[in-house]
Amino acid sequence: MTPNKIAVTGGLGSGKSAFCDILREMGYPVYSCDEINRELWTDENYCQDLSRMFPDCLTDGTIDKNKLSRKVFSDSSALETLNAFSHPRIMKRLLAHMNAVKGVVFAEVPLLFEGGYETLFDAVIALRRSQEARIEAVFHRDGLCRDEAVSRMQSQFEPALLERKNCIVVENDQDIGALYEKAKAVLRTLEIEQL
């Protein structure tokens, strides 16, 4: 049976977004947890709740994303608190979007295994890349220094353990053209008709 709901996951800088961009270019619907999170940040109630949870991360009475980021990536209990608050809200919106689509739909879910959300999907595609390539990618994309990138990576699922999960592992160790070919191969493996 062809899977309908497919998660795309992987650690920071692994190439999830590039892989999902390829799927979009091919014509498939793709939703992103990061985009949904950005939408939630425009919700006044959401931000007020965060302000109450993290009062030390306020600047002029408003939650400061940079302060919050520094706090949660240096304090594992703060990260757990943030994830316990935000992940259910993100996943609720994500599933509502996905359930409205007839046929195959993809979702970029960065912390899929960490949140235990893999059971919500018919199939999982996991991107993997060397740590050095990931560090370089996040430096160019986000301006994170090596220590910040490594700190964030350490809070995520260990890429070496992906074989223990029921997922298709895509090694993102070449250029974008090779990743495109790997995306086509994954679609064939999942028996998804290419658009």
Regions found by a protein language model. Give the residues of each.
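Hydrophobic anchor at the beta1->P-loop junction of P-loop NTPases
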Residues: 8
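P-loop (Walker A) phosphate-binding loop of NTP-binding proteins
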Residues: 11
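ATP-binding Walker
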Residues: 14
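Walker A/P-loop
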Residues: 17
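ATP-dependent small-molecule kinase phosphotransfer cores
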Residues: 35, 39-102
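Small-molecule kinase domains that catalyze NTP-dependent phosphoryl transfer to phosphate-bearing small molecules
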Residues: 93, 119-120, 140-190, 195
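ATP-dependent NMP and nucleoside kinases share a basic, alpha-helical "lid"
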Residues: 93-99, 104-140
